[in-house]
Every structure is written in C-alpha cells, then in structure tokens.
C-alpha cells in the first residue's frame, strides 16, 4: 500500500494556512530555516530525551510516558524562563487529567541554555504573533517520550482535544521500533480534517488551538525498547493556565 505524501506547506504560506485552515505542517529543513539554525544544531537538543522522568499522574494506570516541563515568557525581544511551576488544564480541555496541578521534572539547564532552543522558541513565537499579535506569550514546553514497554503507549490518552491556549506546536523528535502514532487534526466545528504520520525528526505541526482539535493514535512495538519522542509547545496570551487557581 502506498503511503500518501504528508501535507507539507511552504513556510511562506505559514501565516495564511493558520488563518485559513488552523494548522500547518513544515518539513524539517524548513523548521531549521525558520529557526535560523541547522538541523545538526537542533539535533544537539535530542540527547536530553534519554533523561526524561516518569509521569506519575496517568489516570489510566500506565507507566508508558516520560516527560519534562518548563515555562517561559516571550515578549518579542527576549525569552525568559519562569520559576518552575505546575502544569494545569481545566477539565473542559482535558477530561482525564484536567483540574489538577501536575508538577513534572523541569527541563535540564543545559537544554534551555542551548542556543538552538531559544532560536526555535522565538522563531515559532514570532510565527504565532504574525497570526495573533498578543505578546507577551506565556509558553509551556513539554518533552515527551511514549514507550511500548507494556505493549501499547498512548501519546494522547485524553483523546482528541484542544489545549485551551492560542497555539500548539507538535514537533517530531524521533521514533524507534514502533508502528502507529498517526497524527489527526480535525476542524473544531466539523468533520473535515487530515491524518498523517510524522516520521522525520524535526517535522513540525503548528495548530491554531481554537480552530482545530488534535490527537495521536496509540503506538505498538515492532521490537524491544520501542518509543516515540516529541516536543510539544504551547503559546497562550494573558497568563499561564491555572495561574490563579
């Protein structure tokens, strides 16, 4: 069976696509170009995914997710990491894990200090501002590893969802020894949408969170030690979610 080509977008159409369809998918080379660095520069961030901490908050009883989480404020001139804080979502956006403060391990200092990290986040923040000029942005960064040690790993155990922010980026970091993990993006108010499987490291999906819902299907092992690594970034105007809860 022939795999259909991914719906990649020319980066010059990024702003228009987010306004018109609510999402945009960029090739790895274009992500590096947007960030003003090389793919080898971005690759220097990848080893930190081998040092994520177990997510103890999964309500489905699973132990298939490892993660780190940190927060930043992007005012257009600088990107500043905030003191470490818990991640919070309302139950309206996360029926499984909403309504609870989840304090995850912070991102490693060396990862945040890597010049490629700031370049990537500031470039994507500028892309968000081109659609919605709402700086400062309150940015949350989530490093994820979903593994198949227990047979099945669920990238989005909460199902198809929105995140309650302005924009969401899902970046493929790597896949090893798995099948599945299909990404699905649908109109928030209708049945139309896209489904595709991101396989190349640094493929980027950028979403207008108010316009679309998204999910990734479970992964299954093709051998031992299967996993799927992603970086999820969110941008929200006004404040972090849960700041006054």
Q: Which residues fall in each region the model found?
A:
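Short, well-ordered loop/turn elements at secondary-structure boundaries
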Residues: 20, 163-166, 200-201, 227
């Amino acid at each position: 069976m022939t795999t259909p080509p991914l719906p990649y977008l020319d980066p010059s159409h990024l702003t228009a696509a987010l306004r018109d369809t609510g999402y945009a998918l960029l090739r790895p080379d274009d992500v590096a170009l947007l960030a003003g660095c090389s793919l080898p520069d971005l690759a220097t961030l990848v080893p930190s995914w081998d040092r994520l901490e177990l997510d103890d908050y999964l309500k489905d009883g699973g132990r298939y997710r490892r993660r780190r989480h940190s927060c930043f404020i992007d005012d257009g001139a600088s990107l500043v990491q905030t003191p470490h804080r818990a991640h919070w979502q309302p139950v309206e956006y996360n029926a499984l894990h909403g309504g609870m403060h989840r304090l995850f391990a912070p991102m490693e200092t060396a990862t945040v200090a890597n010049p490629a990290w700031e370049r990537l986040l500031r470039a994507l923040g500028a892309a968000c501002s081109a659609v919605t000029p709402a700086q400062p942005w309150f940015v949350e960064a989530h490093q994820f590893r979903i593994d198949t040690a227990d047979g099945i790993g669920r990238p989005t155990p909460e199902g198809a969802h929105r995140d309650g922010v302005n924009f969401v980026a899902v970046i493929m970091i790597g896949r090893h020894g798995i099948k599945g993990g299909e990404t699905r993006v649908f109109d928030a108010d209708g049945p139309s949408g896209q489904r595709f499987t991101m396989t190349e490291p640094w493929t980027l999906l950028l979403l207008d969170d108010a316009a679309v819902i998204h999910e990734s299907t479970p992964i299954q092992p093709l051998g031992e030690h299967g996993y799927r690594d992603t970086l999820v970034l969110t941008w929200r105007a006004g404040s972090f979610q849960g700041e006054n809860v």
